[in-house]
Amino acid sequence: MNLEYVHVVQKFNQVLLELTKKVCTVVGGNKPTYWYHHIRRVCSECPSMPMSMIGPYLNVYKTQIVTKDKNFFMNFDPPAHNEYTFIIQKLKEAARNMPEDELEQYWAKLLFLLKSYIKCKPFIN
């Protein structure tokens, strides 16, 4: 297994758990491992998406989180990616109490990690 891939996955897991705890605290939950499981599952499926699609796809959702536009969000739900919907709904709940600058930092980190993870995915074989 490629060392770069291993390093990215380790970093990915570390930061993801940290960010998940943050979301969990904001939402008021007390089981970060629950959120971690779902977010990690979504991220593990990302390699099946074209790299060019990831950024625009997540950015549309980011816009909905920041603006809290429920109607548009509910109409933008690609059937092939229902797991994303679950995660984004939870992030929207967190966004109600999270300052926008914190949310932006959270999203930027997660998007960067997703792209890094996808980029290194082919090295697993």
From Swiss-Prot:
> Which terms are listed as keywords in the entry?
Late protein, Virion
Principal location? virion
The compartments listed are: Virion
What does its record list under induction?
Expressed in the late phase of the viral replicative cycle.
Q: Name one GO cellular component term.
A: virion component
Family recorded in the similarity comment: Belongs to the asfivirus H124R family.
> What name has this protein been given in UniProt?
Uncharacterized protein H124R
Q: From which source organism is this entry?
A: African swine fever virus (isolate Pig/Kenya/KEN-50/1950)
